[in-house]
Amino acid sequence: MTAAPASPQQMRDRLLQAIDSQSNIRNMVAVLEVISSLERYPITKEALEETRLGKLINDVRKKTKNEELAKRAKRLLRSWQKLIEPVHQNEVALRALAGAAGSANGGAHNCRPEMGVAGAPKSIHDLKNRNDIQRLPGQRLDRLGSRKRRGDQRDLGHPGPPHKVSKGSPDPLVPNASPLPTNGISGSPESLPSPLDGSGHLGPDGSRLEPSDNEKHSTKIPVNAVRPRPSSPGLGKPPVPCLQTKAAQLQQLDRADESPGPPYPRGSSRCSFSPRNSRHEGSFSRHRSSYIPKGQVSSPSPWPQPPDNTQVPSPLPLAQPPTPPVRRQELLPNAESPVHWPEQSEGHPRLTGPACRAGFSPDSSKADSDATSSGGSDSKKKKRYRPRDYTVNLDGQVAEAGVKPVRLKERKLTFDPMTRQIRPLTQKEPVRADSPVPTEQLPRTELEQQEVKASLQSPFEQTNWKELSRNEIIQSYLSRQSSLLSSSGAQTPGAHHFMAEYLKQEESSRQGARQPHVLLPLPTPTDLPGLTREVTQDDLDRIQAQQWPGVNGCEDTQGNWYDWTQCISLDPHGDDGRLNILPYVCLD
């Protein structure tokens, strides 16, 4: 092979030369070279549609007896199938980003960069300082001023990533606790949970109450959670929903058991990063402020409530706050312990609104709620891109919004000759299921008509048993059946016996009914005109006008009259043998 890579069309031509019309391999070396070239070639969907290499490779895979070649071809077809189907393409990107060191912040999630809320650049040193806040309890109070300044920047219209602080601070931002929506149904795994019940519940005295065993078992760690890499170069970018920060928030959850802190009010707004679950969240948000589940009692809230933000949450903004989603905790609040929110310290006067805590202004939440209602088509398109990690509520039922879509064996691809594109066969399956119905009705009507005709005549009358008995296949079958019956010791006569008896009876009845077809014998003549007497005028009139057997013609046994100028066809023996008699007289 040359140094320059061959085009897909050239590789297709080589493959066609190496196989015959039935996809049998004639040149194994050439086929292996084409497979190797295709494994290294970054082929596109358009090239596959133009060359139809997938069909050729699949036909070769089916016909070949070389197991190694079949495995390589199947692996190649799988990679092409993932290229064509977006679902598989998304999963491949997710695996690649999870394994790469420089892209640990999860670029496989479908973020919407056109939304108004954009994350400010975050330095590695800043991130490390925030991790130090979690590790060193003694330094927490020293950094309240810096947190205040960051909160002021967010209120002034400079949205930045909401910082992660420990649970012991007076203003705990707990972005990794996900409460159930107030109607009791688990939310989508892509939603950013509101900071409620992340580390248990608080009693009236501010002390932390341990969550029940039910609540402990209801949490689920994502499958793709990895340990954070603070030195990763990808951390300098605006964060998106990623794997690294999930694990970082898991560590923060474990440390939260040591430092009690008041949670947010229940009505604090929830944020989400992905528009794919806006449909579910939109329906949940309508019931959230008016409906309370059975085990939850609306407790008195002594803290001041910001207007239009605290109790009425915004219905899932499509804009993505920079903080990525982390471990989900589906913990219902403790119904018996009313939550008391202490007065906030003087250092945090601007962080009272939960919309500011979530990282966006109330204006952006209103705009995002409008975008939610108009983004129904986007949510339908993105509905398939669900993550693998799903949440379980307290009853043990899988959350409806987080269920991975069931993909049956419907991803068989086909080539549409009209559009010349490769597409799945899912839309044609119900048509196929319905199509046999009219085809079944047509034979039924024909069969009914045939049955009506057959009922008029007996099947014995329609069957030519004589010809059937002379058939070699029938005779061999009957003899085989008789031999089987005799070998098995059966005393009853076989089918050939009944057939022979029937044919004998039929033959005798036919012979009895059949008569020979001959001429009538002439009586001995006593009156011979011209010999015994003279010819008279009456004799002449009889010859010309009347039938005179033996004189001007003859008669057969069936009553037919023949003159001497006609051919006579007889059956003298009654065995269908014909005796043809030529005319006695030929008149010119």
Curated annotation (Swiss-Prot):
Q: Please list the residue ranges that the record marks as compositionally biased, kind Basic and acidic residues.
A: 123-133, 207-218
Entry keywords, A to Z? Activator, Nucleus, Phosphoprotein, Transcription, Transcription regulation
Example GO BP: regulation of transcription by RNA polymerase II
**Composition-biased stretches (Pro residues):** 314-325
Its annotated compartments are: Nucleus
Tell whether Transcription regulation is among the UniProt keywords.
yes
SMART domains noted in UniProt: TFS2N (SM00509)
**Could you tell me which residues carry Phosphoserine?**
435, 458
Q: What GO molecular function annotation could you give as one example from this UniProt entry?
A: transcription coregulator activity
Primary location group: nucleus
Query: Which family is this protein grouped under?
Result: Belongs to the Mediator complex subunit 26 family.
Tell me which PANTHER family the record gives. CRSP70, MEDIATOR OF RNA POLYMERASE II TRANSCRIPTION SUBUNIT 26
| Record protein name field | Mediator of RNA polymerase II transcription subunit 26
| Lineage, top ranks | Eukaryota, Metazoa, Chordata, Craniata, Vertebrata
